[in-house]
Design a protein with these regions (language model features):
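Long, contiguous binding/interaction regions
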Residues: 70, 75-76
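Charge-dense polyanion-binding interfaces
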Residues: 80-97
Length: 97
């Protein structure tokens, strides 16, 4: 199994924007076949070093993670939207467990 973790800072850190990003991330559970499990969290601390939204998703293996990256819904809908609303700052960690 591989876990993909993405931390995102948003240009507009409003509750509405955070919820929209959360909903979009969660929609991948039903639209991206290689996603086995998914969790999304919204930061409540809002410190200077905090990121606004975190995505954690699980896929079967490295090949599934590669397929996820080019999946039409992820690459064509989710990724472009996040690129538009993020402030340029993201952190990604991918690891096997």
């Amino acid at each position: 199994m591989v876990k993909h973790v993405l931390f995102v800072k948003l240009k507009e850190n409003t509750p509405e924007q955070c919820e929209k990003v959360k909903s979009l991330f969660l929609s991948m559970k039903d639209k991206v076949p290689m996603v086995r499990d998914i969790a999304v969290g919204i930061d409540y601390l809002h410190s200077e070093r905090s990121y606004d939204v975190v995505l954690e998703l699980v896929v079967d293996d490295r090949e599934a993670l590669e397929a996820y990256q080019v999946d039409p819904y992820h690459a064509g809908v989710v990724k472009p939207y996040i690129a538009e609303v993020r402030d340029g700052s993201t952190i990604v960690v991918d690891y096997e467990f």
